[in-house]
């Protein structure tokens, strides 16, 4: 009986090996980084939705935001240098056919001429417009800061211990 079981197991093993086909890749992997590489310039619209854990509706726009995107060292990896005025920060991310997904980046937005200062953590993703020269950015932000606000009662400075919201922007390839 042991001999019969051994023959049956060997037959099954031979049948399994003979029927197993190697898996062929469907296509070569595509590197999407060239789609996004370039130097972009534009503006971000920030929509504040929460201040100090209270629902708020405030908005501001930052002009002259630069984003220089380069190919990273890994497959489909990108690096980005984000510049607002003289503040420059680096982040990295990945590029797919659908979007560029960036790691969080901390950015200081200091606009004394517009009476506000924010230290924000941005989480962004970008998609290319049909014209292939515009990078559409969407994301979220959180952080702190302060702003001088004009009210019917006068001018006062409002500290933002916790601020969060959404951002969007259009950056044009230079």
Model segments located where?
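Edge beta-strand at a domain terminus
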Residues: 138-174
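Predominantly extracellular/secreted and cell-surface proteins with exposed
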Residues: 50, 58-133
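Generic short beta-strand segments
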Residues: 41-49, 103-110, 138-150
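Bacterial Sec-dependent N-terminal signal peptides
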Residues: 4-8, 12-43, 168-174
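A short hydrophobic beta-strand element
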Residues: 40, 76-78, 131-143
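Surface-exposed ligand/attachment interfaces on beta-rich extracellular proteins
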Residues: 53
